[in-house]
Amino acid sequence: AEYRIPTLDTWTSYVGIIDMVVNEYDKYKMYFMNVANDFALATLYVDFGKDILADKMGWKTTVVMQEDTAFGGGVFELVDQMLAPEAGIKIIDHIVYDTNTVDFSPIFNKAVKSKPDFIYLISSVRSQVPSSQYVKLQVPVPMTGINVAAFGKDFWNDTGQMGGGTSTLSPIPSVGFAMDDRTQAFVDKYEAKYGNSRPIFPHFNGFNAYYGIYNAFNAAERAGGFAPLDAWVTEMENEDLKIYKDGKLWLRYAFWKPGEIEPRTQREYTHNIKFDITQPLDDGAPSMVVIQWYEDGTTAVVYPEKYKTGEFTVPSWIKQ
């Protein structure tokens, strides 16, 4: 704000930043966030928990395994405050582990002794370790949650091909996602140039960064440049990049304008990406999807229904 520099934030989800834009628009109007904020992400935790974990699978209890980081603590608060009461799932134990942990057998044993219906993992640092040990130990309880390492195609080799059964919330597009033609062309170009180095696939914020640059430069072209600032801000607010697949709106890179109210949460999200968190998701892209790695190394989107390319399953060693 001090330097009045046009800013496109491609990976921060903290809703407090968006609230600053809402509350002090003139001061922060040059800031745009093109990933859905925490409030929007939380709705997917709840919807997946209710529709799949509770209603489809019949699961009612969980043990949360959370890394000892600020990220882990923040996600646990959302899960504790929203997933449990709104999806009807009870947290019967909460295990916090050090990110330098190399032996997860005592942690998994503790979780299993509580006899939960499933384990909810929250991991962003060295997530490959609990993932591979979950398979190696053949932990007899299903596990889902947030596993950042599983966002990328490198995950399978990083786990020594022991990532089967892992499911996680993921930004979009994701591994296992049905790509539209334009996005597939970007993936093909990326893999041709960088496919032999890490990451081998443009995961995490790669896609929203790519399309966000189009937003920023298209706005600048119409405004006559990035300065004067007000002209660029106005054109960024008018940006609306819609991408279709098979006649359906598939991805959307636009921004909430000042005064617009998101209907489900009844809040303003000025300059946040224009996500859609109300079924049937026909006005924008969802805040996230849920992906799953299968035991043969393939992946699929398992939720929400519109983007589903496979079924949510439990590992073969678990008898339901």
Annotate the PLM regions.
Residues 1-2, 79, 109, 116-137, ...:
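Hydrophobic alpha-helical
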Residues 27-31, 60-65, 112, 167-172, ...:
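Flexible glycine/proline-enriched surface loops and loop-helix/loop-strand junctions
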Residues 49, 62, 79, 119, ...:
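Residue-level signal for nonpolar/aromatic packing positions in well-ordered secondary structure
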Residues 14-18, 51-52, 86, 185-193, ...:
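Soluble receptor-associated domains flanking membrane spans
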Residues 14, 35-39, 134-211, 221-222, ...:
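Extracellular/periplasmic periplasmic-binding protein-like sensory domains
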Residues 41-46, 97-111:
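Structural motif
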Residues 193-203, 217-302:
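Segments of small-molecule ligand-sensing domains
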Residues 1-93, 142-168, 175:
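Extracytoplasmic ligand/sensor domains, especially the bilobed periplasmic-binding protein
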